[in-house]
Structures are given as structure tokens and as C-alpha cells.
Design a protein with these regions (language model features):
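Accessory carbohydrate-recognition regions in carbohydrate-active enzymes
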Residues: 1-338, 342-350, 354-386, 392-443, ...
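ATP-dependent phospho-/nucleotidyl transfer catalytic cores
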Residues: 463
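C-terminal structured "cap/appendage" subdomains that terminate the fold
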Residues: 670-729
Length: 787
């Protein structure tokens, strides 16, 4: 729950607090969400510390976040799992480490060459001045989004003692949803003799009162304590507990988890916890560059950051079930992160599914997005359905109430909520009757954005398909047939003759590529409405398809969403003109239209597998790593709410999931060998591992095409594997070559499964299609061996 870091006043997206630019640090707070986009999230109750005040007058120190910011010393930031530190221009070095519900801060004061009883301070206008060394630490009852409405604060101390306690509470707004939440804080500070203490509101500070029971809305307010100078080499230490239940619970959390104020010991314990969490994966990185290793481990680490375990901290209802928050959003995470967790942390993934079902029991709907105990804005379909089915098909069934799970996903499919902009699905009456979402639909049953008719439709169809899998498994045969049929609804908005054109006022229609056939919106009467197939891509009006717009796709183009038919890729390929045209079309998308900063782009990297060209999936995986995912400051192409990290981690390990299905698409790992602890009970007790080994491994990655494979010593020609490999363990050996040779993964029986609606006899075997060419470095091409 606690993730301590320095907060900045960056004008860039600072939803997670810290931004690596030249912005000023304004505080050190304890609650954060990562990679959310939108408004800043959490960042409640930041601490701030001055090394001293001008003229030794505490009223001349800057208290508000708007004026107290100080620049960081370039290159001083250090981050590792469980630890963050930074040096500021005001003679402060801040270090922080965490436990589950508390943070421990250590503030030291290098003299910066001034020496003696002085330290440097920075004035609000940026001037560096010498001040008497007498640290003043404050607790600000504010958040990153400056959303507080009401609240209170109190400080407890005895003059002449060396310990004080500051507490506070406030009501805040979520960053990407509706409603509000209350949070509570308890900060114990010590390290030197206390000189004075009091409270502040805005720029005004005083020693009295010690208690404010009603802070006006917005702006900085809180408590403060000023110390004598710590002894040589000494520090001011702050232990901060947080809670969503009460101040008493916040104090109890801190006292239970950090009883001794031992910073180094707390840091070691945090490191040990992270080592244990990451130890389920081992790699042989011989020859692999340090930056590539950093990119992999950083991605794996980030995949474990959210959702956050708030069990025991839910003020909304009493329950013995786990409670997880910060699902930011499942529209992002269902594609990569949750499937990865089924492999590396199935206990947490099981708890998350249970938490989703408990939300359904108490709120009435599964969330698509949820943060700070509030309903978040839905971005597409009811994607928790996919997460739940994914858990079932991968046998994460223990302790999950599958009767309630089925009830919940059927509720999404059948029952429209009053406000489907924050849960469930919308336009269901028309969707059920027509099999699509009309652009001119008048929804009398609920309210939500009148947009995203293409992107919502393809997601609704896939979610219905996933529900059909669960229905069949649980014995609901009629439901299974109904939802399987709805899984084919994507065909209702497939416009075969739609060209890749742009309509210009003066130039008329411009044909941009030779490809035809795209998802297009329809009206109630069945007529088509033109939608620029490149709208919301890097080529056209990139940022025009967000929640507050009326376009038919969300954060992506029709070019992109026209590939999203993972339930029946075989038929989609036929609609696109057969395997050869499909492959050319997918290559064109990667070359000309793709943007990897949104999660819908993940699966198309590997969809060449369905066209019998797993070599091209490998090629593009090696293009995006390291061009888009790397160890540089810009080494993540989009906001990472754990999904970007999960994508990178799985690409490095040599597989990618088709979420909601028991399918992982195989590409060569970026390591000689990857070893993952098997998750099945017997396999885990026996210490078995799922091992992916590369024969002819080349750390320059010139050899990146799978020539042949064996699974547990037997020839293996499929280009995909099932979850049993990770559950029971085994050895998958991949022989790689510099050029795509042989027929591995190209035959009709080697392709990932498709689940047609009705019978089809016209599916072309991709193995009968001659390979053309694959791009190589420098824009050249490598010839493929025909077979």
C-alpha cells in the first residue's frame, strides 16, 4: 500500500509523484499510484523539511507546497526496490524505505561547504541563502491533485523532548473516477531536542493552536516541529503510518510494522521481500548487456506494483475477503499483467479475482477501473470478465467462488447499469437486438459516453466469447452457445469495401494504402457511417479519442481495433484476404501506423503467429525491444500501470498470452535460459521449473528466429503453449538461426486456436503460402526460405 517517493511540481504527468525533469521537489509522500495518466493520484500527507529558517524565525520558512519547492541535485536520485533517495539544493538529503502500511524517512544535512552552524536554504524566488541550522519538519494535509475538502491536524510534543507526533486526516477525490475517500496519517518524528511546534494554514504558521479540527478546503495546511541541530552525522527520522480507516489505525500500522525506527534494518527487510517476490524467475544472462538486463528486471518489478493490497483497510464494507484497489485500469492490465501474475504470483492473482468478486457483491457490478475506493471511468468493455475467465482456464480455481463469478460476468453481459460510464456495459438493448452499437443509439436504460462504438463492440464481443468458455466449463450449455454466438458480433461492423482513405476538403479522397476491410460504425437503420480508419493513430489526430470525445474508437484507430478478434483470428484473416495479405497488412501497421504506448498494441506484435509467420513476431518483438522499451529515461513508451512492465518482461522471457484463453505465443527469449518456478501444488513442492532454453543463443540477437523446438525432449511444432507448462514445469528448447528457415510453427495444426461461429471450410493453411521477406536492419530485407 505504501510507496514513498519525492513529489515534484512538474508540468509533465506526475501522477506517481516523481518526474525526472528539472522540476522542483515539493514534498515526500507515502501513497502513490504508478502510470495512471490523467490527474495526479494520491500523494497524500507529504512531509517537508527545512534545514533552518531565515533569521531563525519559523514564520519565515515556506510552508505551502506552492512556494516551498526546491531543486534537486542533478544525478543524485537513487531508486531500488524498497528504497529511494535524493539530495536537494537546500542542504537536505532525503532517504525513504517502506513496509506494507508505513514509511520510514531519514533526513540528513550535508553542509554543502558552508560548515559550522549554518546550512543552505532556498527562498521562494530561488535564491540560495545561509540559515541557522535548526531543522523544521512539517506534515501537510494535502494530496498531489490538491483535491482535499476539509480535514484536520494535531501535533503532540513536549518542549525539550526529542520525539513528537503529528496526525491528520482529509477527504480527497480520486484521480480518474467519481466519488471521494478519506485518508488518515500518523507521523512520529525524532532525532534531536525539540525547540517548538505548532500548526499552519497556507503561508501562516504559529505555535498555537496545536490542533485544527476543520481545515478549509484546498491548499496546504498541517502541523510542524522544529528541532535543535542534530549531533554531527545525525539525522531527523520520521515514521509515517497511513490508513483509510482512522488515525488510530494509521498509528497502529506504523507502530506494528516499524517499532524501532531502524532505517537500515527496515530497508534490508524491504529488499528481502522484493528478492523473494522476484526469485520465482531466474535467467542465464551470460553475454546480455547490462541495459537489457535492467530493462527486463525493471519491467518484472513494475508488473508487481499495482493493483495494491488494501486488505483490512476497506472502510466501505466488512468482509473476510481480500480487498485490492488501484485497478488502473483493467482495460490496460487484462492484456498482459494479470496473465503474467498467474505465472509469477498466482496467490496474488487469486486474491485479486476474489477482491473483484467481493466488489461485485457489495457494489453490484465488477469494475473496469477502480481507485481510492471509488468507481473509475470505464474505457471500453467489462474487461474484468476476461480476467476472471483467464484465471479459470489457467486453473486458478482454489478459494474462488465460481458461482458468484459466473453471476458477475453474466450481469455484465445482460444487465445495463444506470451509469455504465463507470461500470458494466452500455447500449445493451441495441447490442442484444442488433449485434452492434449504433452511433445514433438513444440509450434509455443508462448513461455513459456516446462514443467508442467500434472499440466497445469488439471488446464486448470478445468478453462474450470469454463468458462462453466459463459457461461451458460450468455446465451452462445454452448460455455457452448464446455467448459464443455473440463472440462473432465483430463481423457486424466489418465493412469489407472500406478503403484506407482520408477525406480532405480540398484534395478529396486520398488512398493511403492498398488494404481494404475495416471495422466501421453503423447507424440504427444498418447504414454505415464513415470513420477515418487512421483517426487516433500517430498519423491522424493522435490525441483525439479519449473519454471526453465522441469518436468511435478509444485511444487507438480502426486500423488497430480491426485486428482485435483473438477469439477467431482464422476468420478475421480470411476477411482480410487470406494469410499472405493479413501478414502484409500487419507488417504495414507496424511500419506505418503503430504506437506502442497503449496496451491494445501489445497483442498485434505477436499476431503474425496466426498467419503462420512466427518469425515476424520475433522480428517485431526485437524491434520494440530495445527501441521502445529500454533502460533510458524515456525507456517506457506510455504510462505504466504495471502493464508496460509486464509486456516487456514476457517478451524478454519468450512468450506472450492471449488473455482469456489458455494460449501463450512463443518467441525466443532474450536470455540463454529462463527458469520460472512451477505453480502447480505438486510441481511447486517438488521444486520443478518451467525452463525455456535457447540453443545457438546469440547475445547480439542476430539469431532470433526459431528453426525448431522440443518440449520435454520431443519435437514440438506448435507456435504456442498452454498454461500447463508453467503450472507443471518442463523444458522447452528453441533452436534459433539468423534467418527464418524450416517450417516451425507455420502449419495449419501449429497455429493458435480459433473458435469460429458456425462452420467454415474456406480457411487457407498458412503453410501453403510462400514466405515473402522480413525487414532487416537498415531498411534492407532478408530472403525467406520457401517450403
Amino acid at each position: 500500500m505504501v510507496k514513498a517517493v519525492a513529489d515534484t511540481n512538474s508540468h509533465a504527468e506526475n501522477a506517481a509523484g516523481f518526474v525526472s525533469d528539472d522540476s522542483k521537489v515539493t514534498g515526500f509522500s507515502h501513497l502513490h499510484d504508478s502510470g495512471t495518466g490523467g490527474n495526479p493520484s494520491l500523494g497524500n500527507f507529504p512531509l517537508w523539511i527545512h534545514p533552518g529558517c531565515p533569521g531563525d524565525d519559523f514564520t519565515k520558512c515556506s510552508f505551502p507546497a506552492s512556494s516551498r519547492g526546491v531543486g534537486r541535485v542533478n544525478g543524485s536520485a537513487r531508486a531500488t526496490p524498497g528504497y529511494f533517495s535524493i539530495e536537494l539544493e537546500n542542504s537536505v538529503r532525503a532517504e525513504m524505505t517502506t513496509t506494507e502500511r508505513a514509511a520510514l524517512y531519514r533526513f540528513s544535512f550535508p553542509d554543502g561547504g558552508i560548515g559550522g552552524s549554518k546550512r543552505w536554504s532556498i527562498t521562494p524566488d530561488g535564491k540560495r541563502v545561509a540559515v541557522p541550522f535548526s531543522p523544521l519538519i512539517l506534515l501537510d494535509v494535502v494530496d498531489l491533485g490538491n483535491s482535499r475538502t476539509g480535514g484536520g491536524t494535531q501535533v503532540y510534543a513536549d518542549e525539550g523532548s526529542s520525539a513528537a507526533r503529528m496526525v491528520g486526516d482529509g477527504k480527497f477525490l480520486p484521480s480518474f473516477g467519481t466519488g471521494n475517500y478519506r485518508a488518515y496519517v500518523c507521523a512520529d518524528v525524532r532525532g534531536a531536542k525539540i525547540r517548538r511546534y505548532g500548526t499552519f494554514q497556507g503561508p501562516d504558521s504559529a505555535e498555537e493552536p496545536k490542533f485544527i479540527d476543520s481545515i478549509y478546503s484546498g491548499g496546504s495546511a498541517g502541523s510542524w516541529v522544529q528541532f535543535d541541530p542534530p549531533t554531527a552525522g545525525g539525522a531527523i527520522v520520521a515514521r509515517v503510518g497511513v490508513s483509510f480507516m482512522s488515525v488510530d489505525q494509521a498509528c497502529a500500522n506504523a507502530e506494528a510494522e516499524i517499532p524501532t525506527f531502524d532505517f537500515d534494518g527496515t530497508f534490508r527487510a524491504a529488499q528481502d521481500s522484493w528478492r523473494e517476490k522476484l526469485s520465482v524467475v531466474e535467467v542465464d544472462a551470460t553475454g546480455v548487456g547490462e541495459d537489457m538486463q535492467t530493462t527486463f528486471w525493471s519491467g518484472l518489478y513494475r508488473s508487481l506494483i499495482s493493483p495494491q493490497n488494501y486488505t483490512g483497510e476497506n472502510p466501505l464494507w466488512d468482509s473476510s475477503e481480500p480487498y485490492y484497489d488501484s485497478f488502473y485500469c483493467i482495460w490496460d492490465s487484462f492484456r498482459a499483467q494479470h496473465p503474467l501474475l498467474t505465472i509469477i504470483d498466482p496467490i496474488a492473482q487469486t486474491e485479486m479475482v476474489r477482491a473483484l468478486l467481493d466488489i461485485y457483491r457489495n457494489v453490484g457490478k465488477l469494475p473496469d477501473c477502480r481507485m481510492s475506493f471509488s468507481k473509475g471511468f470505464s474505457q471500453g468493455g467489462s474487461n474484468a470478465d476476461v480476467v476472471i475467465v483467464d484465471a479459470y482456464v489457467k486453473k486458478l480455481r482454489k478459494d474462488i467462488d465460481w458461482a458468484t463469478a459466473y453471476e458477475a460476468v453474466v450481469s455484465d453481459a445482460e444487465d445495463e447499469p444506470q451509469s455504465w460510464g463507470v461500470e458494466g456495459r452500455g447500449n445493451l438493448e441495441s447490442y442484444h437486438r442488433l449485434g452492434y452499437i449504433p452511433v445514433d443509439d438513444v440509450d434509455k436504460n443508462g448513461t455513459g459516453p456516446s462514443s467508442r462504438q467500434i472499440s466497445r463492440l469488439v471488446e464486448y464481443a470478445y468478453e462474450d466469447f470469454c463468458i462462453s468458455l466459463l459457461a461451458k466449463a460450468l455446465g451452462h450449455s445454452e448460455d455457452a452457445e448464446k455467448y459464443h454466438k455473440r463472440g462473432g458480433n465483430w463481423k457486424n461492423i466489418w465493412r469489407e469495401e472500406q478503403a484506407d482513405i482520408m477525406r480532405e476538403v480540398h484534395a478529396g479522397e486520398l488512398t493511403l494504402s492498398p488494404f481494404t476491410g475495416f471495422m466501421q460504425p453503423k447507424r440504427l437503420d444498418g447504414s454505415w457511417k464513415y470513420h477515418n480508419v487512421r483517426l487516433c493513430s500517430p498519423k491522424t489526430a493522435f490525441h483525439s479519442c479519449y473519454l471526453d470525445t465522441r469518436h468511435s474508437t478509444y485511444e487507438g484507430s480502426s486500423w488497430l481495433y480491426s485486428f482485435f478478434v483473438p477469439q477467431d483470428m482464422a476468420e478475421l484473416i480470411q476477411h482480410m484476404g487470406g494469410p499472405q495479405t493479413f501478414v502484409k497488412r500487419l507488417e504495414y501497421w507496424h511500419e506505418e501506423v503503430a504506437y506502442m504506448g497503449n496496451e491494445q498494441a501489445f497483442l498485434p506484435v505477436f499476431q503474425f503467429h496466426y498467419g503462420g509467420r512466427p518469425d515476424l513476431s520475433s522480428y517485431w518483438a526485437h524491434r520494440y525491444i530495445p527501441s521502445q522499451f529500454n533502460a533510458s529515461i524515456n525507456g517506457i513508451p506510455g504510462n505504466d500501470d504495471s502493464s508496460m512492465g509486464a509486456f516487456a518482461a514476457m517478451v524478454f522471457m519468450g512468450f506472450f498470452p492471449v488473455a482469456g484463453q489458455d494460449v501463450y505465443l512463443i518467441t525466443p527469449p532474450f536470455f540463454r535460459e529462463v527458469r520460472i518456478q512451477a505453480t502447480g501444488p505438486e510441481a511447486k513442492r517438488a521444486g520443478r521449473k518451467a525452463i525455456i532454453r535457447v540453443r545457438n543463443f546469440d547475445p547480439t540477437y542476430e539469431k532470433k528466429y526459431i528453426e525448431s523446438a522440443t518440449l520435454n525432449g520431443q519435437a514440438y511444432t506448435k507456435n504456442w503453449i498452454t498454461h500447463d507448462f508453467f503450472r507443471e514445469g518442463g523444458l522447452l528448447e528453441l533452436t534459433v538461426s539468423q534467418r527464418p528457415v524450416g517450417t516451425w510453427g507455420t502449419g495449419k495444426d501449429d497455429l493458435p486456436p480459433s473458435y469460429p461461429v458456425g462452420e467454415r471450410d474456406d480457411i487457407t493453411d498458412p503453410s501453403l503460402i510462400p514466405r515473402t521477406e522480413v525487414p532487416a536492419k537498415g531498411g534492407q530485407s532478408l530472403p525467406h526460405q520457401e517450403h
